[in-house]
Structures are given as C-alpha cells and as structure tokens.
C-alpha cells in the first residue's frame, strides 16, 4: 500500500497553459454560482457539478444515477461524473482568457522579473501592461534600409526640383533687371529651405534607425510612425506584447551577452547585469519558459476551497474569491463579445485593461492601485492573502493544527503526587480515552458492539470507570502550558484519576512550565500510536526532563514552602530543648526527638556511621536521610542554592527513577516542616532601624551642600546630579547594613529571605528602611529619593515618584513578551534544519575559549568548556601532564583540573567550525545539557538553541540606559541589544574602529576631534646571486624599483635570474645591503587612516598608543560587518557569541555558549560569488559555503579555474529567507516573494529541515531511536493490514 507521503522532495515551478488545461475538468464560462430558487449550482458556473463533481456522494445533478454502484459513470443527461462529493476539494476548472494577462507576482514584484528579463523599468512595464504605451515587438531591417534609401532619394529629388525652380526664378529676375540684392535674397532663402528639408529628412532617418525591439512609444508617436512606416516595425500594448517579446528570448545568447557584460562593466551596470544573469540562469537550469509568466489560461480553485454557505434568513456567506472570480469572468466574457462584434480599438483596449486589473485583484488584491472591496469597505481576500501572514494557509493550517484527543482545564497543586504523575479529572479522562474504553467494553463482553458501548460510556456506568482506571495505566498523557517557549513546556505524565474538574500538577515541575496556581490553564493531549506512547514514556516523561537544555542546571528544584521547610529543618536554635546531648547514632537521636525529649533544631552531638562525632541537629539528620549514601553528610543550613547544588550532584549519580523518589521525599519534608514551623509575617516583624533618622539627616545635609554649590556655579549640572545619586546610594547601603545587623536571625522575615524561599534584602530594606532612588520611564535615576519605608507609608509626591517608574515596568513586560516571542520565531526559523547527522566531521579546527578579563561579565572558563570536546591536547602549564587529550570530552573532573592548573585558554571543537555539510556532528556540538551525555544522533540542536535563547528573552530588560547626567550617550542593552546583534544591524551608537595596525595620534583643533592611525612597517626583499655574478650596487646605497642589482660577469653564464633574462633588477625601492652573494633591500610601507570623532563620543586611546586592527577607538558598540571586513569570519563569530552572552549573563540568565554558536554559524553560512571562474555560479549569487567548496573542488579536479567569493554576515531574518528550503522560507515571511523566486528557479525542497516536513505532514527528521523503530513497525503493519477489513472506529494505529 503506497502512502500519500511517500516522496523525498517537492519541486515548485511555473505552470504552462497546457499544464493548467490538463489540471482542469472543464472551462468555467459563466459568473453564476448557485441558483437561488433551487439552491443547486448553475451549469458552467463557478460551482458547476459537471466540472467540479457532485454535491452529494454518488449522485448526479439530475438524479438519474444514485448509489455507489454507478461510480465512475458520466450521466448522459446532466454530464456529471458519479463520485464522492469530496472531489469538489480537488478538481480544478479553468478560464480561457480573451487576451493574455500578466501575472502580478512576476510583473509587479521587487525587482520585477519580467522587467529584469526585458530590461524594462517597473514604470515602463506598468505603462505597457495597463495600455498606456506601445512597445516595439519587431523591426524589419530590410524594409528599414529601403525606407532610408527612399527618404534619401526623396530628399535629393526635392532639393534638385527646388534648385531648378530657383534657377528659373533667378534667370527670370535677371531678365527683368532685378537688383543683385533681390537675387541674392532668393538664393539665401533657397539655402535655408534646403537645410530645413535635409534636417527634416535626417530626423525621419534617425527615427527609423532608433527603432529597436523593446523601445517604448507614446500613442501619438506610434500613430505618426505607423502612418509613414507601417511595414518597417510592429508595436503593440498590454501583456500580449510582453508575451511576444518573452517568447523571442534566446537564453543561451542572453547568457553569453550578460557574462561579457559582468566582466567588462563595473558599478551599478555590473550589479544589474549580475541580477539579470541570475534570472537567465534560473530559466536555463529549470524547465520553465519566460512566456509562462504571462497567462493565457487562468486556473479556477476547487469550489469547496472557496465555499458558499447559506445563513439564517436565506442570505449567503461566500468566500471573497468567488466575487473576484466573478469579476474576471464578467470582464472576460464582455471582452470576447466586443472583439466578436468588432468594437472600436479604444473600447477593446479599455476592457483589456479592466481584465488585467481583475486578474491582478484575484491573485494579489491591493498590490497595485486601490484594492477591490466587497460588502462595503471590507478588502477582498485574494489568493495571496490566503497564503501570507499569521492567518494564512502556512502558519494557520499547516504549521499549527487543531489536535484531536485533547482537553484543557485550570491547574491546581497536587502535593501528594509523584514527580511522574499528574491528576486528571475523571470526566475529562472518560472523554479523552473514550475510544479505548469502548474497545475494552466490547473486548470484555460488557457491550455487544461499539454502538451500545458508546451508550454505556455516555451513561457513565460504574463498570465504565473501572475500565477507565485500567485504560489510563496503559499510556501517559502530555501536558502543555502556553506559551510553549522551550521543550520543557510540554511534558508527559502518568495520569491519576481524581474527582473535581481541575488538573493537578506536581509542584516541582511548575518552574519548567513557568506555571503558578492563580488561574493558569493547561492543555492535555493523548499520544495514540505505539511509537508516540513509547516516545512519551522514554523521552518526555517529567522524570527524564530534570535539567535545563539551555544551561544544564536543575529545573526541578524545590521552591517557596518546600525551600523554607528544608531550611527551617536544617537551621539551629540556640538554647533549644535538649541542646548539648550526646547520642550513639542517628537512629537514637531521631527516637529521642519523636519522644519529645529534644527539639528538632537543638544542637546535639552524634556519632556518624564511620564513628566520628558530629555536632549537628535532628533536623539535619532527617534531611540527610533522604539523600543518597554517595552524598556526604550535609551538616549546614540548607537554603535554595544548596538544594540546587545537591540536586545537580545527585543527577550525575542516580537514575531518573531514583532521582524522582529523592525529589519527592525532599518535597514532602519541605511541606511537612514548613507547616510545623508555623511561619507567619506581621507588621511587628518589620522594625525601622534606629539609625535611619540620623543617616537620612546626614544625606539631606550633603545634598543641600551640592545644591548650594550648583546654585553658585561652582559645579556643573552633571556633577550635582552624580553627587546626589552617590550620596543616596551610600545612605541606602548603610541603612541596609543597619537593618541586617538588627535582624532577629530566628525571625520569619529573615528566614524567608535568607532561605531563598521568597523575597530578598532589597525588598526588606524597602519595607523597613527606605525605598530609596527610583527611575523615570526612560531609565534615568530620579535625583529625589523616597525617604519613607513601606512600613511608615509614603507621602503623595513619593507615591507618585514610585508609580512613575513602576508603570514603565508594566509596559515593558507587555512589550517584552511580544518582542521576545518574535525573536524566538526568527531564531527557530534560522536554525530549524540544524540537526545532528554525523558522528564526527573530522575537523581539526575549533575555537579558543578564554578566561574573561572582567569577572561577572562572562561565565568563567571552567563553566564554558564543560561538556565540550578538546580540539588539541590541554597540557598542565607546570608539569606538562596532558589533562585532556585531543578529541576527548571535557567532563566535570577534567574541567575542575583545568581550573586548578590555572589554564586561561582552551582550544575546543565548536559548532562554528563544524565541517558537516548538512546539520552538525556530535563531537563539534558536545554534551546535550538537558540529558548530561554526548548529544544523540538526529537531535534538533538548532531548535534547542533557539528556544534556549528565546525562552529567557522575557526576563531581559527592554530599556536603553542613559549614561551620565544630562548629556549622555544611549547604550542599548537587554532584548534590543540581542536583536541588534542577531539581525547584524549597525548599532545605535556605533563605535569607530581601526582598520589597520599602527600608532594612534589624537588631534583636537577648530575642525573638531580626529584620530590618525599610521603604520610604518619595515620589510626585507632578498636576492640570492648565482656564482660568477657581479653586484652593481654597494651596501647603504638607495635603489629604485627596476634598477639593476647584479649582472652575469661574462656571456654564457647561468641565467637563472629573478625578473630579467640578463640582469637581477630591484623589485622594490629601498636601501641595499650586500653580504657575499646575498643582496638585501630594506624598504618600509607606510599606511595612514584618519577618523573624525563626533563630539558626544568618548575617545578610548591616547597619542602614542599602539593600536591593533579592529580595536575600538571610541566608546559604543562595534558594527559586526566592520569586524568581518577587517578581522574576518572567526573574529566576528567570537564577537557575536561574547556580546550576546554579556547581555544574558549580566541579567543573571545562564545560557551555554554553544547555543549562541549554532545561531552565529547560520548567520555566516553563505558566501557571495565575486567571480565565477569555470563554474556555473553567477557573480553576486548567494551560495551555501559547503556547496561553494564542493563545486570548486570538482572544478579544480578537472583542471579548471575555481570561483572566488567572500563570506557574508546575514541577520537571522535574511538568513531564514535565503535558506535552501523554499517551503520553510515561504512559511516564515514575504511568502509571495519567496514563492515567486522559487517557481522561477524551479527549486527543489529536499525536506531536510523540520518545518517543511511538518507542512507536508511527514514525520520530522529529528527522530529518537524508539521513533525510528516504530516507523519501521508502522510500515510493516500497514503492509500487513492493507488486505484486512477495518474492525472498529478506533483512531489509526492506537492498539
């Protein structure tokens, strides 16, 4: 049995008129849709049953044939074929156009493909298509030559005739004794007239010579020339003229001409010729013909894809396409009629233009001129509108589909659940698992057939719930919380049936879903096939997803009450009951606590299992009981950070199941002891420190001094502002110290903040001390502090100031969410085809990871190299011992050893330098951080990278910092900075960088500030003389280029010389030194660059400083394009990785470098061809780097000249649109432009990425091992079941 999806690639191309007719089941000739009385489709109309198929299954229009037994028969009465009604979704019709019509995608696109091919501007093309100008379509050279000769003959004849007439007149005047002056006047008049006649004739000859195919003529010019030279040229208007011209083009000749032009011209002309050459090559390589861009036949969409629905009250709702088709048919029919009756040319021309406009509106409404509206002011949705945008076919129906077997409900906490479980309401489960329950009822004999089983389920009999309990044990369910920002937003759980209507969620998975219980909703999905169930169990179960794929940190760490409970359990209370008692072992201590003899937090002495005496508490003993034996006794307070570390450690030594058990035990301990702690918070717990009044008064005094100095003009506005800010920041810190010093260490507020359960010292300072300095909406600190605390209450002005900045925070959050979502979408698109497809690409290249100079700006070296593969040996600097061998993984122990050895740079394999031609290899990627092992084959690492960068996007700030006081420079940070880098845009404040190595000189004068960089490098050029040669120069002598340095002493000596057959001549000018037979010329090459520095910029170098190429000369951010052009590919990749990392790390978000590297790789994967050599590549063409290298390797192997190219840095949007897959690009943005290009090039989508496979409904290529096995199983089962009849109504392959 062949599946519909059994193919490997999809090709898109232009459709020829014959192809359109072959798709069609008949011509639509009438604009009618359905008859409003009979409600049946009109014959030959837009819904005709004869063309598109019957409305009712196996029933013709007239009712003569009914039932399936007549399948395939065509009714002799009404002409309808007996078939299923669903053929009306597949069968197309066509309209034979009365005149050719331009396809708006090809005529109006940017650039216009038709215009580029015919060398016409968009404006000229529009004038032709819309019948305002004529274009010459043919010139008869013989007729032209004859016409020119005829004109010359006429000219000379006229001159001769006029001359003889003048001679006669002069003779007559002489006979009449006319004056000499009068006779001369007649001759002068003749001379002027002759010149005028020759000019007029020459003008006509020039006009004739200028007649070239493709020239435009206005209406007046056309009729004037046509009247005189009707046999010399042909010209016409509209799309038929373009059709004729396009059909004349000889692609091979055109190619040769354009290749010559690209080599012989430069600048704008060369660029245009390059574009034209690419287009010509596209037509040559594909089987498309350029005339197919002009339509003579219009396909009609199947009627069920543009339906008409009857509403209440007898009115009809119809798709806009029907109105647009109706306009086309009406105008086409009218044009045919006018042509048949021989209407005047002007009327026919007008009708042709209207037909062109109607077809334009049908294909892409609103692209040209005013858009066609239906029902008042509603813009009609054309065919293009159905494809593009969020509501278009690609994004709405192909990439995002509604899913069967799913439900949705509010979530509540399930503290008693295991980590792998979720609570599923019984009613919901019964609906979701209905087919399975019905199947089991029939199988167990509780119902005779499916129908009665359905009745039993609907009545919810007790035996139904018993079977439901069994059924839910067989398969997990998947829970999803929107927004689905990363893979942990969808996880699988074993369902536990519960009463009520809300889903119950395990408290430890909340952080993965970013869920809380304030009304959040979640969706439930049931995996149906065996493969889906297996994958859900083996990879999606929550116990297999405990680590963040972005950083490798634990994601199932306890929080809030659980953290507080564990902290409370492990803290000590001085003077507690039983303090100082000594016990023989842990069990005895616990026994005494249970009997109430000692307090939970009393400090006691106990012998551990090894016989050592420990000073600890019963609480710590209880906490350590839940930890594995491999973890040493944790004898300390356990705040949130400590719990995270313990979990991270345990993950490496325990299996997923054991880890889940341990986490559940920690959860239970936390909840139990948080409850027994009796934690509460009251106003009295927050006490204002005594020192506050004194500190605030001192700060007011200092502020008053600064204000006074400013008023007297002793300090500037900037200095005043900075002084006030500094004063209050210092005061705030002192008050914070006072609050901390006065804290009750056993108090609930301190314990909450210190444990990491909730709140921090900054919030306590605002409640007890003072709120301090606030920012205004632009992010600038307001130099008026809030001196009150929340405990004391704020004044009206203070309240206003605090809300002023806070409102910006709320607006930021709303904007951040959409901005971050769009960034994630672009990142996903650019990396969706990056999949692990190779074990090892075998490269020896890599990237240097260096210990950051500034701590806190970037992660430390040890964290960055963990999980990477070394690209060469990492050697201990002192002992010379190899810590990590070449091509070995750097695990925790080796990373620690690198840190201890004081190594500051390590050369590692990287996605940036991976040489896998498709996807990526396992060694270059390294460890899968979410699974803590080497990445598996077929893992979609591109998607993981995009999610890891996009998911924390909402946490980034959205502001532009305003540095300094009044006059400062805006520095872009946070999300806008990340976007700026990934889109490879010039930064908002662009730093000036040096293009050369050299010495700096800072110049300040009345013309402003400049930095001059000059380099004076000294080089040597050496000449080795053969024996018997004589030098012609002396040491210390200055020589010019081309001067003779040495010559043979006598004839017949060796002539193996450098540049001349006879003498050795200097290649460069410089100072000579002679040493025996070696002549050396010392010469220097000086280079200089000067940069103008804007007034607001701060200079980073001083006169005399040594400067490297690519070094920043001023503050601001560097343009990545400059780094690429000056320092090359590796430098720009490193810059992008470090700059993005700085933004995230400064906000406390940890992302592994490799995710950013995957994106950077995609941004630099294309090269632009400079010269084509002996390849088929076209100058200016963008080509994949690996394809370019392959083509060059083949050409070199055949002894040809390779192409040359330079690396291009593309922003993620451009990189997404220039992907090899046209399906992925079309579903991203600019759908019509992508499809236009893909059709012309006849592009083949090899379906290597994820998006294209989702679009066509195939399994994505990123399959886990279990899925692959299941795919094979499924194919075998389909083959076996092909002959067997269907048994029940169960979903496919779910048994």
Curated annotation (Swiss-Prot):
<feature type="binding site">
    <location>
        <position position="841"/>
    </location>
    <ligand>
        <name>Zn(2+) 2</name>
    </ligand>
</feature>
<feature type="binding site">
    <location>
        <position position="78"/>
    </location>
    <ligand>
        <name>Zn(2+) 1</name>
    </ligand>
</feature>
<dbReference type="InterPro" id="IPR045867">
    <property type="entry name" value="DNA-dir_RpoC_beta_prime"/>
</dbReference>
<dbReference type="Pfam" id="PF04997">
    <property type="entry name" value="RNA_pol_Rpb1_1"/>
</dbReference>
<dbReference type="GO" id="GO:0000287">
    <property type="term" value="F:magnesium ion binding"/>
</dbReference>
<dbReference type="GO" id="GO:0008270">
    <property type="term" value="F:zinc ion binding"/>
</dbReference>
<feature type="binding site">
    <location>
        <position position="921"/>
    </location>
    <ligand>
        <name>Zn(2+) 2</name>
    </ligand>
</feature>
<dbReference type="InterPro" id="IPR000722">
    <property type="entry name" value="RNA_pol_asu"/>
</dbReference>
<dbReference type="InterPro" id="IPR007081">
    <property type="entry name" value="RNA_pol_Rpb1_5"/>
</dbReference>
<dbReference type="Pfam" id="PF00623">
    <property type="entry name" value="RNA_pol_Rpb1_2"/>
</dbReference>
<dbReference type="Pfam" id="PF05000">
    <property type="entry name" value="RNA_pol_Rpb1_4"/>
</dbReference>
<feature type="binding site">
    <location>
        <position position="518"/>
    </location>
    <ligand>
        <name>Mg(2+)</name>
    </ligand>
</feature>
<comment type="similarity">
    <text>Belongs to the RNA polymerase beta' chain family.</text>
</comment>
<keyword id="KW-0804">Transcription</keyword>
<feature type="binding site">
    <location>
        <position position="75"/>
    </location>
    <ligand>
        <name>Zn(2+) 1</name>
    </ligand>
</feature>
<feature type="binding site">
    <location>
        <position position="914"/>
    </location>
    <ligand>
        <name>Zn(2+) 2</name>
    </ligand>
</feature>
<dbReference type="InterPro" id="IPR007080">
    <property type="entry name" value="RNA_pol_Rpb1_1"/>
</dbReference>
<dbReference type="InterPro" id="IPR007083">
    <property type="entry name" value="RNA_pol_Rpb1_4"/>
</dbReference>
<feature type="binding site">
    <location>
        <position position="60"/>
    </location>
    <ligand>
        <name>Zn(2+) 1</name>
    </ligand>
</feature>
<dbReference type="InterPro" id="IPR007066">
    <property type="entry name" value="RNA_pol_Rpb1_3"/>
</dbReference>
<keyword id="KW-0548">Nucleotidyltransferase</keyword>
<dbReference type="InterPro" id="IPR011054">
    <property type="entry name" value="Rudment_hybrid_motif"/>
</dbReference>
<keyword id="KW-0460">Magnesium</keyword>
<dbReference type="InterPro" id="IPR042102">
    <property type="entry name" value="RNA_pol_Rpb1_3_sf"/>
</dbReference>
<dbReference type="GO" id="GO:0000428">
    <property type="term" value="C:DNA-directed RNA polymerase complex"/>
</dbReference>
<feature type="binding site">
    <location>
        <position position="62"/>
    </location>
    <ligand>
        <name>Zn(2+) 1</name>
    </ligand>
</feature>
<keyword id="KW-0240">DNA-directed RNA polymerase</keyword>
<dbReference type="Pfam" id="PF04983">
    <property type="entry name" value="RNA_pol_Rpb1_3"/>
</dbReference>
<dbReference type="GO" id="GO:0003677">
    <property type="term" value="F:DNA binding"/>
</dbReference>
<comment type="subunit">
    <text>The RNAP catalytic core consists of 2 alpha, 1 beta, 1 beta' and 1 omega subunit. When a sigma factor is associated with the core the holoenzyme is formed, which can initiate transcription.</text>
</comment>
<protein>
    <recommendedName>
        <fullName>DNA-directed RNA polymerase subunit beta'</fullName>
        <ecNumber>2.7.7.6</ecNumber>
    </recommendedName>
</protein>
<feature type="binding site">
    <location>
        <position position="520"/>
    </location>
    <ligand>
        <name>Mg(2+)</name>
    </ligand>
</feature>
<feature type="binding site">
    <location>
        <position position="924"/>
    </location>
    <ligand>
        <name>Zn(2+) 2</name>
    </ligand>
</feature>
<dbReference type="InterPro" id="IPR044893">
    <property type="entry name" value="RNA_pol_Rpb1_clamp_domain"/>
</dbReference>
<keyword id="KW-0808">Transferase</keyword>
<feature type="binding site">
    <location>
        <position position="516"/>
    </location>
    <ligand>
        <name>Mg(2+)</name>
    </ligand>
</feature>
<dbReference type="InterPro" id="IPR012754">
    <property type="entry name" value="DNA-dir_RpoC_beta_prime_bact"/>
</dbReference>
<comment type="function">
    <text>DNA-dependent RNA polymerase catalyzes the transcription of DNA into RNA using the four ribonucleoside triphosphates as substrates.</text>
</comment>
<keyword id="KW-0479">Metal-binding</keyword>
<dbReference type="InterPro" id="IPR038120">
    <property type="entry name" value="Rpb1_funnel_sf"/>
</dbReference>
<dbReference type="GO" id="GO:0003899">
    <property type="term" value="F:DNA-directed RNA polymerase activity"/>
</dbReference>
<dbReference type="InterPro" id="IPR006592">
    <property type="entry name" value="RNA_pol_N"/>
</dbReference>
């Amino acid at each position: 049995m062949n599946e519909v999806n059994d193919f490997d690639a999809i090709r898109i191309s232009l459709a020829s008129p014959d192809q359109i007719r072959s798709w069609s089941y008949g011509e639509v000739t009438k604009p009618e849709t359905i008859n409003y009385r009979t409600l049946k489709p009109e014959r030959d109309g837009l819904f005709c049953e004869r063309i598109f198929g019957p409305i009712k299954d196996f029933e013709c229009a007239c009712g003569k044939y009914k039932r399936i037994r007549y399948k395939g028969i065509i009714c002799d009465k009404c002409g309808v074929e007996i078939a299923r009604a669903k053929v009306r979704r597949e069968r197309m019709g066509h309209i034979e156009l009365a005149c050719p019509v331009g396809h708006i995608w090809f005529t109006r696109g940017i650039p216009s493909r038709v215009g580029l091919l015919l060398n016409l501007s968009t404006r000229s093309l529009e004038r032709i298509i819309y019948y305002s100008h004529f274009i010459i379509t043919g010139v008869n050279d013989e007729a032209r030559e004859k016409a020119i000769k005829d004109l010359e003959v006429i000219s000379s004849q006229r001159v001769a005739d006029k001359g003889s007439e003048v001679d006669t007149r002069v003779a007559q005047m002489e006979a009449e004794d006319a004056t000499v002056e009068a006779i001369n006047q007649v001759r002068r008049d003749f001379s002027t007239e002759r010149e005028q006649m020759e000019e007029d004739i020459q003008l006509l000859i020039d006009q004739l010579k200028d007649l070239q195919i493709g020239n435009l003529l206005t209406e007046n010019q056309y009729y004037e020339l046509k009247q005189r030279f009707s046999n010399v040229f042909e010209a016409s208007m509209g799309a038929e003229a373009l059709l004729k011209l396009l059909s004349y083009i000889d692609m091979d000749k055109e190619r040769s001409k354009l290749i010559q032009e690209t080599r012989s011209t430069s600048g704008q002309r060369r660029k245009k010729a390059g574009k034209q050459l690419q287009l010509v090559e596209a037509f040559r390589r594909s089987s498309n013909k350029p005339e197919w861009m002009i339509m003579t036949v219009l396909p009609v969409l199947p009627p069920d894809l543009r339906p008409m629905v009857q509403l209440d009250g007898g009115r009809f709702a119809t798709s806009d396409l029907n109105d647009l088709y109706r306009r086309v048919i009406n105008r086409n029919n009218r044009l045919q009629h006018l042509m048949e009756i021989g209407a005047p040319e002007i009327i026919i021309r007008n009708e042709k233009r209207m037909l062109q406009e109607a077809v334009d509106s049908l294909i892409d409404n609103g692209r040209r001129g005013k858009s066609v509206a239906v029902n008042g002011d509603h813009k009609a949705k054309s065919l293009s509108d159905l494809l593009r945008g969020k509501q278009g076919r690609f994004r709405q129906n192909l990439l995002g589909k509604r899913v069967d077997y799913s439900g949705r409900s509010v979530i509540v906490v399930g503290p008693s659940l295991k980590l792998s479980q979720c609570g599923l309401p019984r009613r919901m489960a019964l609906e979701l698992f209905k087919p399975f329950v019905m199947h089991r009822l029939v199988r167990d004999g509780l119902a005779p057939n499916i129908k009665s089983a359905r009745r039993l389920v609907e009545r919810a009999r007790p035996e139904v719930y018993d079977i439901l309990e069994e059924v839910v044990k067989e398969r997990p369910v998947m829970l999803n919380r929107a927004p689905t920002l990363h893979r942990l937003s969808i996880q699988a759980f074993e369902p536990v049936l519960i009463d009520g209507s809300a889903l119950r969620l395990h408290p430890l998975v909340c952080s993965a879903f970013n869920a809380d219980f304030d009304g959040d909703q979640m969706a439930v999905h049931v995996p149906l096939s065996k493969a889906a169930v297996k994958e859900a169990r083996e990879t999606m179960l929550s116990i297999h997803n405990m680590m963040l794929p972005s950083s490798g940190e634990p994601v199932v760490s306890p929080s809030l009450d659980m953290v507080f409970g564990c902290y409370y359990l492990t803290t000590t209370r001085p003077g507690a009951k039983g303090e100082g008692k000594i016990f023989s072992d842990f069990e005895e201590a616990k026994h005494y606590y249970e009997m109430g003899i000692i307090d939970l937090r009393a400090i006691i002495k106990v012998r551990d299992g090894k016989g050592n005496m420990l000073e600890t508490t019963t609480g710590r003993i209880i906490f350590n009981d839940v930890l594995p034996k491999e973890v040493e006794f944790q004898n300390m307070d356990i705040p949130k950070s400590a719990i995270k570390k313990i979990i991270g450690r345990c993950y490496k030594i325990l299996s997923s199941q054991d880890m889940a058990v341990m986490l559940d035990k920690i959860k239970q301990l936390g909840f139990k002891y948080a409850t027994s702690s009796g934690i509460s918070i009251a106003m009295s717990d927050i006490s204002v420190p005594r020192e506050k009044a004194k500190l605030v008064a001192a700060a007011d005094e200092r502020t008053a001094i600064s204000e006074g100095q400013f008023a007297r003009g002793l300090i500037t506005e900037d200095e005043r502002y900075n002084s006030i800010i500094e004063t209050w920041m210092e005061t705030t810190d002192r008050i914070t110290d006072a609050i901390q010093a006065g804290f009750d260490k056993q108090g609930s507020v301190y314990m909450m903040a210190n444990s990491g359960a909730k709140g921090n010292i900054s919030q306590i300072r605002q409640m007890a001390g003072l709120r301090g300095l606030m920012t205004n909406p632009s992010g600038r600190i307001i130099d008026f502090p809030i001196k009150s605390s929340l405990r004391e209450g704020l004044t009206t002005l203070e309240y206003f100031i605090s809300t002023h900045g806070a409102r910006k925070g709320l607006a930021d959050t709303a904007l951040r969410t959409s901005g971050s979502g769009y960034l994630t979408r672009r990142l996903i698109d650019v990396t969706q085809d990056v999949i692990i497809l190779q074990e090892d690409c075998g490269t020896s290249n890599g990237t240097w990871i260096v210990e950051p100079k500034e701590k806190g700006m970037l992660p430390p070296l040890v964290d960055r190299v963990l999980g990477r593969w070394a690209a060469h040996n990492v050697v201990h600097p002192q002992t010379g011992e190899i810590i990590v061998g070449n091509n070995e993984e750097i695990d925790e122990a080796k990373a620690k050893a690198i840190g201890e050895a004081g190594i500051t740079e390590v050369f590692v394999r990287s996605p940036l330098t991976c040489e896998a031609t498709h996807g990526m290899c396992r060694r270059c990627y390294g460890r899968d951080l979410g699974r803590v092992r080497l990445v598996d084959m077929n893992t979609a690492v591109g998607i993981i990278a995009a999610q890891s960068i996009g998911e924390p996007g909402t946490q980034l700030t959205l502001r532009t910092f305003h540095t300094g006081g009044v006059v400062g420079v805006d520095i872009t940070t946070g999300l806008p900075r990340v976007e700026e880098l990934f889109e490879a845009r010039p930064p908002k404040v662009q730093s000036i960088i040096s293009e050369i190595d050299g010495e700096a000189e800072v110049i300040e004068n009345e013309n402003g500030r400049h930095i001059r960089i000059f380099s004076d490098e000294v080089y040597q050029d050496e000449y080795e003389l053969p024996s018997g040669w004589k030098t012609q120069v002396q040491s210390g002598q200055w020589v010019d280029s081309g001067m003779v340095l040495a010559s043979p002493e006598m004839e017949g000596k060796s002539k193996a010389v450098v540049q001349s057959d006879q003498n050795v001549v200097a290649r460069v000018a410089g100072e000579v030194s002679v040493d025996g037979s070696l002549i050396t010329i010392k010469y220097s090459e000086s280079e200089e660059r000067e940069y103008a520095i804007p007034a607001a910029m701060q200079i980073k170098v001083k006169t005399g400083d040594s400067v490297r190429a690519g070094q920043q000369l001023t503050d601001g951010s560097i343009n990545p394009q400059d780094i690429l052009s000056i320092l090359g590919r590796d430098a720009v990749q490193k810059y992008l990785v470090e700059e993005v990392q700085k933004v995230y790390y400064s906000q406390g978000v940890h992302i592994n470098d490799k995710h950013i590297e995957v994106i950077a790789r995609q941004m630099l994967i294309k090269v632009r061809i400079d010269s084509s050599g002996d390849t088929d590549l076209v100058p200016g063409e963008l080509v994949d780097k690996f394809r370019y290298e392959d083509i060059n390797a083949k050409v070199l192997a055949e002894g040809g000249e390779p192409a040359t190219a330079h690396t291009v840095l593309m922003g993620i949007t451009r990189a997404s649109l220039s992907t090899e897959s046209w399906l992925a690009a079309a579903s991203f943005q600019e759908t019509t432009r992508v499809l236009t290009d893909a059709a012309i090039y006849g592009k083949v989508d090899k379906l290597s990425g994820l998006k294209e496979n989702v679009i066509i409904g195939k399994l994505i290529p990123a399959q886990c091992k279990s899925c692959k096995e299941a795919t094979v199983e499924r194919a075998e089962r389909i083959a076996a079941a092909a002959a067997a009849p269907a048994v029940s109504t169960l979903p496919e392959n779910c048994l």
